[in-house]
Amino acid sequence: MTTHPIHLHHDDPAHGGERACMSRRSFLLAGGAMVTLASLPGTAVAALKALKADYPAVKIGKLSRLKTGEPLEFAYPYPDVNNILVKLGAEAGGGVGPQADVVAFNQQCTHMGGPLQGTYKAKHQALGPCPLHLTTFDLTRHGMVISGHATESLPQIVLEVRGDDIYAVGVQGLIYGYSSNRAGR
């Protein structure tokens, strides 16, 4: 088998006037270097730190005051991040309370950040459709997409019950517009 070196020149008539910008050997060496760099310990440590973000515990409501199908809005983990707390009346993924039916979700569509305020449908236990591209989310299944353009579930607010008080203690999923939920925009 004969091999031909590949040069940066684009004027070789034998190859239609175009040549690749890199030899196979150079490509394999560069690819191997990238894999090696990606596996360095510093990269893995940064990823683990992102998974262990510390969130403040914030009291957001009382179990005794929640009515089935009537959502309450609250801000968490930042003052400008709007969320919804709702008692669904049926067991839900990530739900708290005696029936595991109290859940909380961020109110920005994960597709393009469309506002979901006022779109809760108690009959279907869903949030949406988003006014931008009609994505709808199932609140009984960790906010997964029912229909529409979004490919990610809604960020779910992690809840804790202490007596009658409900606390937001974390966020499961990335809030739209943030590179990291605890690192800011």
Swiss-Prot record:
It is found in: Periplasm. InterPro entries: AioB/IdrB_ssu, Rieske_2Fe-2S, Rieske_2Fe-2S_sf, TAT_signal. It holds the Pfam family Rieske. Its cofactor is [2Fe-2S] cluster. Residues 1-46 form the signal peptide. Its main location: periplasm. Residues 69-168 form the Rieske domain. It is an enzyme of class 1 (oxidoreductase). It comes from the Bacteria. The keyword Lyase does not apply. Predicted to be exported by the Tat system. The position of the signal peptide cleavage has not been experimentally proven. [2Fe-2S] cluster binds at C109, H111, C130, H133. Its EC number is 1.-.-.-. GO terms for molecular function: 2 iron, 2 sulfur cluster binding; metal ion binding; oxidoreductase activity. Keywords: 2Fe-2S, Iron, Iron-sulfur, Metal-binding, Oxidoreductase, Periplasm, Signal. One of its GO terms (cellular component) is periplasmic space. Binds 1 [2Fe-2S] cluster per subunit. Involved in iodate respiration. May accept electrons from cytochrome c551, and catalyze the reduction of iodate (IO(3)(-)) to produce the chemically unstable intermediate hypoiodous acid (HIO). This intermediate then undergoes abiotic disproportionation to yield two molecules of iodide (I(-)) and one molecule of iodate. The resultant iodate subsequently cycles back into the reductive pathway. The initial reduction of iodate may inadvertently produce low levels of incidental toxic H(2)O(2), which is detoxified by IdrP1 and IdrP2. The iodate reductase (Idr) complex is composed of a molybdopterin-dependent iodate reductase (IdrA and IdrB subunits) and two associated peroxidases (IdrP1 and IdrP2). Belongs to the AOX family. This is Iodate reductase subunit IdrB. The gene is idrB.
